[in-house]
Amino acid sequence: HEEWLSGAGQANVSLYNQSGHGPIYPTPVVGMVGLIPDAARAAAVGIGFREEGHAIAMCGTPQPSLAGSELAKLRGVPLPTTLPQADFAAVKRAQDAVRDAVRAGDLASAHDIAEGGFLVAIAECCLAGDIGAKLDFTSGHDAPPSYAELEPYLFGEAVGGFIVSGTREAIER
């Protein structure tokens, strides 16, 4: 049984802001409060990678697009009028999978893919855990993909993706 506290009717999102340096990207934010049945277990799963040899995986459906990303912003690419459409059913499946794996004690770490995309999230996990990561992008390819092919996957900021780590057996579950 999940209970939620609601701030219904209390919303303030401004999609037009300016500063002396130019427009500020729109940033709608949703905050929620809920009950966690086993808060100690949830708190034990941080963003930092924990052990050498753990498997690292992405949970969620990648949407290869740099539209509205930090990388596009750094390159001076104007904010597009449309962004990739989120598949909310897929996002919910990814969130449910991560939640269930945390509850089962299967994950050593979990981190959302947000600002900066997949590669920035990996770097944040490495820094938080004071441990490196070895990544292989050739799996399932006859030849290694080019950087141009990988870039939207590495730096895209599509909603609903997570980096998780744990034992290989736990990750494969």
Regions found by a protein language model. Name each.
Residues 4-5, 9, 13-31, 80-82, ...:
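Glycine-/charge-enriched secondary-structure boundary and capping motifs
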Residues 71-75, 96-99, 147-150:
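Short amphipathic alpha-helical segments, especially helix-boundary/capping motifs
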Residues 46-53, 73-76, 122-128, 173:
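Short, solvent-exposed amphipathic alpha-helical segments in soluble enzyme
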Residues 1, 85-100:
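Structured alpha-helical segments in the cores of large, soluble enzyme domains
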